[in-house]
């Protein structure tokens, strides 16, 4: 009997080493991948909300600088307004991508005319250059910004004036797409025709015959002013900016 108990003792003792081996592997696995220590620094605080006044100021700045798109939308529909916005977004407006050298060259090439000379075109338009521009020449489809004063020749009735005077608040310059109709705000076919032979920075006095003005019927403008039938029109037009349409 004693031998039997003695023989079984080593067999029974195998469970203890097995347990130690398992514990050893567990400890090894645990020690090879120790837990990362928790960071003692607190998370950064969230950014403070933007003040309402600052948001309103930013919105106001966008609205005040986008009057050209608004003007085009009112005159030619949302397509023209979106076209202008697209030009702004992709940076193809010539005034925005010009280098300082190009701007200085444009200014250097712009010159006042000492003595006005009458130029008579085959279609009956007469004009007198007061300043020869040194910038780009607008073509059909280009966006142009102009200052304009128009009056009925003979009566002197002023029906549009963006140059402004001491007694009258200056209107905003007019924006138009060259070659697009209908015309508004005192513009007519004769002015659209003359713009194509001018350059940015140029200023010209133009006499438009009735056939290229408001014709035999005359016109009633948005301001309520009446242009009489068969009226010849006298304009002063100055090109402030030419934004060449992308090819």
Swiss-Prot record:
Disulfide bonds: none annotated. It comes from the Eukaryota. Its main location: plastid. Its EC number is 5.2.1.8. Residues 141-243 form the PPIase FKBP-type domain. This is Peptidyl-prolyl cis-trans isomerase FKBP17-2, chloroplastic. InterPro entries: Chloro_FKBP-type_PPIase, PPIase_dom_sf, PPIase_FKBP_dom. Residues 26-64 are annotated as: Disordered. Residues 34-51 have a biased composition (Pro residues).
């Amino acid at each position: 009997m004693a031998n039997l108990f003695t023989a079984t003792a080593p067999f029974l003792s195998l469970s203890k080493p097995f347990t130690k081996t398992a514990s050893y592997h567990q400890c090894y696995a645990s020690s090879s991948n120790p837990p990362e220590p928790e960071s003692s620094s607190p998370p950064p605080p969230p950014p403070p909300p933007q003040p309402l006044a600052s948001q309103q100021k930013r919105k106001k700045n966008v609205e005040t600088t986008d009057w050209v798109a608004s003007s085009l939308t009112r005159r030619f529909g949302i397509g023209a307004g979106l076209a202008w916005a697209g030009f702004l977004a992709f940076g193809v407006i010539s005034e925005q991508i010009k280098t300082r050298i190009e701007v200085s060259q444009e200014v250097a090439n712009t010159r006042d005319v000492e003595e006005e000379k009458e130029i008579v075109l085959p279609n009956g338009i007469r004009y007198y250059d007061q300043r020869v521009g040194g910038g780009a020449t607008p073509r059909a489809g280009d966006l142009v910004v102009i200052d304009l004063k128009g009056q009925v020749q003979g009566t002197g009735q002023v029906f549009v004036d963006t140059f402004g005077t001491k007694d009258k608040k200056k209107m905003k310059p007019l924006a138009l797409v060259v070659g697009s109709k209908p015309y508004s705000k005192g513009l007519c076919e004769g002015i659209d025709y003359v713009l194509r032979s001018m350059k940015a920075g140029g200023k010209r006095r133009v006499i438009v015959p009735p056939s290229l003005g408001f014709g035999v019927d005359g016109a009633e403008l948005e301001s309520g002013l009446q242009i009489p039938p068969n009226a010849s029109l006298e304009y002063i037009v100055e090109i402030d900016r030419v934004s060449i349409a992308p090819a």
